[in-house]
Amino acid sequence: MKAIVIGAGIGGLSAAVALKQSGIDCDVYEAVKEIKPVGAAISVWPNGVKCMAHLGMGDIMETFGGPLRRMAYRDFRSGENMTQFSLAPLIERTGSRPCPVSRAELQREMLDYWGRDSVQFGKRVTRCEEDADGVTVWFTDGSSASGDLLIAADGSHSALRPWVLGFTPQRRYAGYVNWNGLVEIDEALAPGDQWTTFVGEGKRVSLMPVSAGRFYFFFDVPLPAGLAEDRDTLRADLSRYFAGWAPPVQKLIAALDPQTTNRIEIHDIEPFSRLVRGRVALLGDAGHSTTPDIGQGGCAAMEDAVVLGAVFRQTRDIAAALREYEAQRCDRVRDLVLKARKRCDITHGKDMQLTEAWYQELREETGERIINGMCDTILSGPLG
C-alpha cells in the first residue's frame, strides 16, 4: 500500500512518519522549493509532546524545547504581576512538560528525521482524481503521482480541501494582527524560564523561552485587515500601539530585529463536518485552520497523525480506516478551533466588558483555574 502525502510541514511529516510506522509506504510532496515556516516559534503542549514521542521524535522535543517552568500575566502599564504560578502541577497531571520550540528548528529536525532527500520539493498540486484503483494528483509542472490513498496536509490555503468538502470555505479574519520573532533572553524583559504575558487594552505582549537562550516573542493588536504596514514601519507601528506600556515592553520593541520579525493577520476557518472523501483525508491546518490563541494548531496536526497511524494498524481497508480517522478527529478539532476562537475574542477585546472581567479574574488567579482548563484540553487528546 502506498500513500501520497501533500505537504512537508509539521502535519505532513508527522503523517508520513505515522503511516510508515504502520507499514505503509509514503511519497511526500511539498509545493515550495524551500520551506520557510510562517511564525518564529510554536507552543507544543504535552499532548503534542506525547505525540512526537509516540512517533519516535521525542528527542527533538527534549533537545529543542525551551525551559518553560512558570507562567505569569502582568499589568500592561505597571509591569507588576497580576498572577504568577508554577507549571509543575500541569506537568505532573499530563505526564509531560510543554516544549516551546523554534519553527525553523522543528521543521529542520523533522525533515532530517523523515529524510530530506525523500521529499519532492517544488510540487504544487492543481487537482486530484479518485477511481477504483486509487488516487492521482497533478502538479503545476505537468507531472502527476498516484497512490492508494492521499493525505492532504497542504496547510490553511489547501488546494485539495475543496475537493474533499465539495465547496471552498472562506477564511475568517479573527480581528487582530500578530507580530512575532526571536530575541536573546534578557532578565530585564522577563524570567528566562517563564511564559510572561503583558495584557491590557485588548492587546497583549508575550515572551516564551525556546532553545539556545532565546525568547519567542509576540505582540497582538486588534486592527482592521489590510493595513499598509511592513518591516519598514514595524518598530514605529509597535511603539505607537504600545505607547505607555511597561518598560520591558519598550525594551523588547527596541531589541527586536524588524527584518526577522513576522507580521501576520490572524485567520481561522469555520470547523468542517467532514475531513474525508473516499481515499482522501484532510490533516493539520488543511482540516482545521485555527487561531493560535490556545497554542494547539501544531499539536492538533500531530494528534491527527497519531490517529491516522492507529487506524491503519487496525485495518487495511482504506475507506473504513479513513472513516474511523474522521470519526475520531472531527469533534476534537472542532472543539479546539472554537475554544481558540472564544479565547481570542476575550483576549482581544471583542467585548471589552468581558475582557476587563478577565483582567480582574487574572488578578485573583492562583493558577489552578488556568491549569485546569489547559489540562482539560491536553488530556482530551488521543494519547491522554
UniProtKB/Swiss-Prot annotation:
Pfam families (alphabetical): FAD_binding_3
Effect on the protein of changing Y216F: 5-fold decrease in catalytic activity. 2-fold decrease in affinity for urate and increase in affinity for NADH
Subunit note: Monomer.
Top-rank lineage group of the source organism: Bacteria
EC numbers, comma separated: 1.14.13.113
Protein name: FAD-dependent urate hydroxylase
Involved pathway(s): Purine metabolism; urate degradation
Effect of R204Q: 160-fold decrease in catalytic activity. Results in the uncoupling of the NADH oxidation and urate hydroxylation reactions
Protein family membership: Belongs to the FAD-dependent urate hydroxylase family.
Cofactor needs: FAD
Cited PANTHER family: MONOOXYGENASE, PUTATIVE (AFU_ORTHOLOGUE AFUA_6G14510)-RELATED
One GO BP annotation of this record: purine nucleobase metabolic process
Top EC group: oxidoreductase
Binding site residues for FAD: G11, E30, A31, S43, V125, D285, G295, Q296, G297, G298, C299
